[in-house]
């Protein structure tokens, strides 16, 4: 059986990913929306994406950023950072539009709750 290595294709693919991340990290801060979520994500298994505050569009519904970074914080440190293109996050959030909760100070922020496990359901997210 002949073994052929596709290292050159893998290398090119990997470098493409490196370039995309490098471009993102060098992006203008106004192009990136960053939200930090404390232990709540760990307790519930959901991330909360803000869409309204005091009845007005906010968060995902108001952002002009190209990218959304959702930091999952636990026990005084960042556990991980989830990076999304804003249009992709809007597409995901729309699936859960009926799963909202009022949270924050005086319960003034309306958030869409997205189950973390659903973010990684490749069959659901990627059309093969």
Residue map of PLM features:
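Nuclease catalytic cores
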Residues: 10-22
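Catalytic cores of nucleic-acid endonucleases
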Residues: 5-8, 36-81
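Short, solvent-exposed coil/turn segments at beta-strand boundaries
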Residues: 26-29, 64-67, 85-89
């Amino acid at each position: 059986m002949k073994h052929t290595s596709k290292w050159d294709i893998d290398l090119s693919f990997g470098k493409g990913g490196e370039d995309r991340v490098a471009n993102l990290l060098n992006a203008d801060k106004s192009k990136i929306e960053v939200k930090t979520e404390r232990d709540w994500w760990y307790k519930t298994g959901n991330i909360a994406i803000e869409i309204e505050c005091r009845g007005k569009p906010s968060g995902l519904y108001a952002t002009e950023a190209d990218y959304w970074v959702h930091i999952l914080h636990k026990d005084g440190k960042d556990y991980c950072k989830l990076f999304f293109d804003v249009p992709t996050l809007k597409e995901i959030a729309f699936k859960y539009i009926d799963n909202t909760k009022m949270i924050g100070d005086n319960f003034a922020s309306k958030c869409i709750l997205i189950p973390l496990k659903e973010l990684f359901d490749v069959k659901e997210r990627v059309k093969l």
